[in-house]
């Protein structure tokens, strides 16, 4: 018999020609058997075409098949597989088995073979070998011919794996990749298609397996093959840069097959001689088809009406524009949704946003994409049940298991359990029965609540359900036993029953996609376990090995879906759009590197390897360079699929705001269609032509109405006059009536804290003794944001407790150790000058060890991680105290006291603030260290506050009430110095000291002395110092000789005056600061009690308080709302701050 080629470029009517010829054959010979062979993904649409053009009678003797369905049909009629077919999951398991057995024979792939996903790579390569008829002998013969040692090693080991795989496979099973080989044998033995008419359409290329089927069919039948090409002339020279190169290559291979097998060559049909059928109604689209890949090209001179180009701000803007345009086509131009398709090259980046927006716009659509099973709750349940044992009962694995929704525990109990587990750090061995019982007894001794006892019972239920399963799978077991244990575990927790219940709910909600997914997932899991038993049942593996095999199978499982309705917009990948009748096409995401797609992953066999193998007659799939030019054909197909209307779009930024560049396709189209206007949100042609362009479907129209109302409230001009009628429509509509009312409330909504009565606030803030007792840090928090303060200290809101070592915990720990260190030095009468690094290290180590021993339940004793932290803290604190000792050694100040508390009635009385409203506020606090100096009959005070973070004194922050602590402490000590020191004191300095072990960066070698100086400089105290050279020199003797200090922020000129940059203030200025801080505290307290709970976070050049606030979800501060404004901390000069302080104090004195 013979083969005939049907040539035609895109849109020339090749598929229609085939169907018309089939119709003529049916009319002339009703008994003639006809086969229409198309790619698998096009069978459904092709059957619809045949049904529409010919009618039901076509299917009496005409069969629309793919190569796979041809296998099934032939095997049904002639008998076929005598062995069980192995699925992809079983194939991966078999490959895993081969790799484990042959691991010692591998060198190149030995390490690689243990990596996750390697099985998939080998599976794909074996499939490729079979599709291209590459046998083991052909691979082995190469090892003596190739000079590339690395490639020889790859081929040798691949041959070994390939051979062993085939031996194990063919002993009991048949691979889906072998089906076409078996089909060829059946067709040769059973001439079932003799005298048939075969039509092959929509193929770009054929694998050697498929070519063999075509060869056999053409021996007994007439075979017609469509080729998407623009010429009939044959060329022996392959030009891969030609967009039709892959088709031409297919043609050459078919001609060679015909020549070698003496197959007749019928006169070809050329459909390129007339105007393309598809574009009979659109000159623009016809012009694009003709010149989008042609060099040189001609520009289209006509008026543009069928092509649009849209530059979107982002993907949301892009898809919303597409949705609006689809509605326009359906509403104004009488399109059906089924006439429209939306395609892109990266559907996984668009599927969610398309689903959301199309549902809002009430556009029915079919997402032509397979569903990945890895995130299905049943799969999550199974993988997490294994992860619990493999990850030793980690928090993540336990709650991943519980939150799968299939364990039988209700979400309220799971949430309570999660809070309890986080609070007590329950993970790993703490899930042991003994540890839980120990914690339970401690709770009972301390008066456990009923809620806590319920949680312990819940923990026991969780443990029991998993422990019984883990006992059956831990260690090494036969695969069949692990599969049985897993299946029985799923039955015991009634997972399948809950899946069935969900399916019923999905059916009630008409969620067809979910129904299909959940109906299939159960059978997929059981099939996978069956495959595991069939393939590896007698193999002994450990839990991790089995989990790897199982997880690999789940990663590759996908569920195919078919359209549930006829009138839907088709959404999918560009590569799957062929074969459809599309009147209007939207191509989205036309960005550089995305369309055309960039092929980077070469796999085990690189492009170079494939080219070298091709030289020795081993032809495999296309290399990266060829794929790049094949991608041009994909682009050509996409641009030419629409018959009436084409809209191209690209976003300028992705979801993260990262800028994107337009594809080269955009510039090409602009040149071909010079009259094409690039639209955007700023220049939208539809707004000019459609006065009602914002009135679309109810939800988006409702959103536009809200924007219009918002603009009106803000006194902006509104061009549209129809919003009043739109508002009335929504007001009368039952579905939107309540929404419109709530929205109006929202538009008038003022996000401000409600006024709270003074009495209520007093009752909230007073302590158990009925006093208003605050710390200075609390007042600073109020200055940062009044509302945040009210939530934390008024309503007593707290974060979920988590068993972790937080920065505040570190601060308390460091303060305790430094306090103990100072007390030990004082008690044992050790002079600071006698402390060196070794002594400091020994004392600190002893203090920390003692503290951790006394507090056996400390988190620092819990895990190796925290034990390492405690060692690190020893190093940091040792370095810090050695620096403190050096600072004390360099000066004349002496430590008077440390951890001095006022307001606790142990060291000193509270600071009392008398408010204008006659309430008294008692301030309490703790001073880390008080140093004193007796000089020339006067006593000077130095306040030192230890900080574990980067805290620097900022006069600007002090002015706004955000850094008051040091000055409050200084004022309290000076006012009470007669009582505390037994003599009047003067201000010397207020300083922060950072507790740290700094890393010193150097350029080359450094001496020990230089290193010590660098450390001192890095840990130099910062704050304010009295502008008195004698006092400053008493803090650091070295300043006199060096001119600068390594201890304090001060430097002296040669004449004894202070250099610029020295943080010094006069005694009078210290007095001003003390007076101002008292005034500021009174103002803040009075403001706090007035009842106006302002949502007013502070903001400066470094950011806003909201960035670190735990309560931002409560206040919902939004700077776009008129009433929500930041309290801006303006950066003022020092002179301006001093002038403001003086002015405010003077004004205050005048008022009083």
Swiss-Prot record:
Domain UvrD-like helicase ATP-binding residues, every copy: 1-338
Record keywords: 4Fe-4S, ATP-binding, DNA damage, DNA repair, DNA-binding, Exonuclease, Helicase, Hydrolase, Iron, Iron-sulfur, Metal-binding, Nuclease, Nucleotide-binding
UniProt enzyme class: hydrolase
Gene Ontology molecular function, alphabetical: 4 iron, 4 sulfur cluster binding; 5'-3' exonuclease activity; ATP binding; double-stranded DNA binding; helicase activity; metal ion binding
Residues engaged in binding [4Fe-4S] cluster: 785, 1106, 1109, 1115
Catalytic activity, EC: 3.1.-.-
Keyword Cell membrane: no
Residues given in the record as ATP binding sites: 8-15
NCBIfam families linked to this entry: addB_Gpos
Family named by the database record: Belongs to the helicase family. AddB/RexB type 1 subfamily.
Job description of the protein: The heterodimer acts as both an ATP-dependent DNA helicase and an ATP-dependent, dual-direction single-stranded exonuclease. Recognizes the chi site generating a DNA molecule suitable for the initiation of homologous recombination. The AddB subunit has 5' -> 3' nuclease activity but not helicase activity.
Quaternary structure, from the entry: Heterodimer of AddA and AddB.
Name by which UniProt lists this protein: ATP-dependent helicase/deoxyribonuclease subunit B
Organism: Clostridium botulinum (strain Alaska E43 / Type E3)
């Amino acid at each position: 018999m013979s083969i005939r080629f049907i040539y035609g470029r895109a849109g020339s009517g090749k598929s229609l020609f085939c169907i018309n010829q089939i119709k003529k054959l049916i009319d002339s010979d009703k008994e003639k058997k006809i086969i229409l062979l198309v790619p698998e993904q096009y069978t459904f649409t092709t059957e619809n075409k045949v049904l529409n053009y010919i009618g039901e009678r076509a299917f009496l003797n005409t069969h629309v098949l793919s190569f796979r369905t041809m296998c099934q049909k032939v095997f049904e009629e002639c008998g076929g597989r005598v062995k069980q077919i192995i699925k992809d999951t079983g194939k991966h398991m078999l490959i895993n088995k081969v790799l484990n057995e042959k691991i010692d024979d591998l060198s190149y792939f030995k390490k690689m073979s243990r990596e996750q996903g390697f099985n998939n790579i080998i599976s794909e390569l074996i499939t490729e070998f079979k599709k291209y008829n590459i046998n083991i002998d052909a691979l082995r013969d190469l090892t003596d011919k190739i000079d590339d040692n690395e490639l020889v090693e790859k081929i040798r080991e691949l041959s070994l794996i390939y051979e062993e795989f085939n031996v194990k496979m063919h002993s009991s099973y048949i691979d889906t990749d072998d089906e076409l080989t078996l089909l060829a044998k059946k067709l040769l033995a059973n001439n079932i298609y003799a005298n048939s008419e075969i039509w092959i359409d929509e193929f770009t290329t054929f694998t050697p397996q498929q070519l063999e089927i075509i060869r056999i069919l053409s021996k007994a039948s007439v075979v017609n093959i469509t080729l998407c090409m623009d010429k009939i002339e044959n060329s022996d020279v392959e030009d891969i840069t030609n967009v039709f190169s892959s088709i031409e290559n297919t043609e050459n291979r078919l001609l060679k097959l015909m020549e070698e097998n003496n197959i007749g060559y019928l006169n070809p049909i050329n459909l390129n001689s007339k105007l393309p059928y598809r574009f009979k109604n659109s000159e623009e689209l016809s012009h694009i088809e003709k010149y989008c890949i042609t060099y040189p090209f001609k520009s289209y001179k006509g008026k543009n009406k069928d092509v649009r180009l849209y530059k979107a701000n982002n993907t949301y803007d892009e898809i919303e524009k597409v949705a609006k345009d689809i509605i326009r086509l359906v509403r104004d131009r009488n399109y059906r949704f089924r006439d429209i398709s939306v395609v892109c090259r990266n559907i996984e980046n668009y599927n969610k946003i398309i689903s959301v927006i199309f549902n809002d716009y009430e556009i029915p659509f079919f997402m032509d994409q397979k569903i990945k099973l890895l995130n299905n709750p049943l799969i999550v349940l199974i993988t997490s049940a294994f992860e619990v044992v493999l990850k030793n009962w980690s928090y993540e694995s336990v709650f991943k298991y519980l939150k799968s929704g299939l364990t039988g525990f209700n979400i309220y109990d799971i949430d309570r359990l999660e809070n309890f587990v986080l609070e007590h750090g329950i993970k790993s061995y703490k899930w042991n029965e003994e540890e839980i019982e120990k914690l339970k007894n401690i709770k009972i001794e301390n008066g456990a609540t009923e809620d806590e006892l319920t949680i312990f019972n819940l923990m026991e239920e969780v443990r029991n359900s998993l422990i019984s399963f883990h006992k059956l799978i831990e260690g090494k077991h036969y695969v069949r036993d692990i599969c049985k244990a897993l299946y029985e575990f799923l039955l015991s927790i009634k997972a399948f029953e809950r899946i069935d219940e969900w399916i019923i709910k999905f059916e009630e909600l008409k969620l067809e996609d979910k129904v299909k997914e959940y109906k299939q997932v159960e059978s997929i899991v059981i099939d996978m376990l069956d495959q595991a038993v069939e393939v590896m049942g007698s193999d002994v593996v450990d839990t991790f090995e089995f989990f790897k095999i199982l997880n690999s199978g789940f990663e590759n499982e996908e569920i195919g879906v078919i359209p549930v309705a006829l009138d839907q917009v088709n959404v999918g990948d560009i590569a799957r759009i062929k074969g459809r009748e599309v009147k209007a096409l939207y191509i989205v995401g036309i960005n550089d590197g995305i369309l055309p797609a960039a092929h980077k992953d070469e796999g085990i066999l690189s492009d170079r390897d494939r080219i070298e193998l091709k030289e020795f007659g081993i032809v495999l799939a296309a290399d990266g360079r060829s794929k790049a030019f094949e991608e041009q054909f994909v682009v050509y197909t996409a641009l030419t699929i629409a018959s009436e209307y084409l809209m191209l779009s690209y976003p300028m930024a992705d979801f993260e705001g990262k800028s994107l560049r337009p594809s080269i396709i955009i510039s090409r189209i602009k040149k071909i269609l010079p009259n094409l206007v690039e639209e955007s949100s700023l220049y939208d042609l539809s707004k000019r032509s459609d006065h009602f362009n914002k009135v679309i479907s109810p939800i988006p129209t409702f959103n536009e109405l809200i924007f219009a109302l918002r603009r009106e409230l803000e006194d902006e001009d509104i061009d549209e006059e129809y919003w009043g009628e739109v508002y009335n429509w929504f007001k009368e509509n039952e579905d939107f009536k309540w929404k419109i009312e709530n929205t109006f409330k929202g538009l008038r909504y003022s996000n401000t804290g409600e006024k709270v009565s003074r009495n209520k606030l007093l009752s909230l803030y007073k302590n158990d003794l009925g006093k208003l007792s605050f710390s200075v840090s609390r007042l600073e928090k109020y200055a940062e944001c009044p509302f945040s303060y009210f939530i934390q200290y008024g309503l007593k809101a707290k974060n979920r407790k988590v068993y972790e070592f937080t920065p505040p915990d570190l601060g308390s720990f460091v303060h305790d150790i430094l306090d103990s260190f100072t007390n030990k030095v004082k008690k044992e009468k050790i002079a600071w000058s006698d402390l060196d690094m070794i002594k400091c290290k020994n004392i600190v180590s002893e203090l920390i060890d003692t503290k951790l021993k006394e507090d056996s339940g400390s988190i620092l004793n819990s895990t190796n991680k925290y034990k390492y932290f405690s060692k690190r803290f020893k190093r940091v604190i040792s370095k810090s105290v050695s620096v403190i000792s050096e600072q004390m050694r360099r000066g004349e100040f002496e430590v008077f006291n440390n951890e001095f508390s006022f307001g606790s009635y142990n060291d000193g009385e509270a600071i009392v603030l008398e408010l204008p409203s006659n309430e008294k506020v008692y301030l309490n606090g703790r001073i880390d260290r008080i140093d004193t100096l007796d000089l020339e009959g006067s006593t000077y005070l130095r306040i030192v506050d230890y900080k574990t973070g980067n805290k620097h004194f900022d006069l600007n922050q002090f002015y706004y009430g955000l850094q008051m602590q040091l000055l409050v402490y200084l004022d309290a000590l000076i006012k009470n110095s007669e009582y505390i020191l037994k003599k009047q004191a003067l201000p010397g300095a207020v300083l922060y000291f950072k507790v740290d072990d700094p890393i010193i960066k150097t350029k080359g070698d450094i001496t020990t002395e230089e290193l010590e100086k660098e450390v001192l400089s890095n840990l130099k105290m910062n704050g304010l110092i009295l502008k008195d050279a004698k006092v400053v020199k008493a803090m650091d003797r070295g300043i006199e000789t060096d001119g600068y200090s390594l201890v304090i922020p001060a430097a002296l000129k040669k004449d004894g005056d202070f250099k610029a940059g020295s943080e010094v203030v006069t005694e009078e200025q210290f007095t001003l600061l003390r007076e101002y801080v008292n005034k500021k505290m009174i103002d803040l307290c009075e403001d706090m009690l007035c009842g106006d709970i302002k949502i007013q976070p502070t903001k400066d050049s470094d950011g806003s308080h909201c960035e670190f606030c735990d309560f931002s979800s409560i206040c919902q501060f939004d700077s776009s709302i008129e009433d929500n404004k930041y309290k801006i901390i303006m950066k003022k000069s020092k002179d301006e701050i001093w002038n403001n302080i003086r002015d405010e104090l003077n004004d205050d004195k005048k008022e009083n």
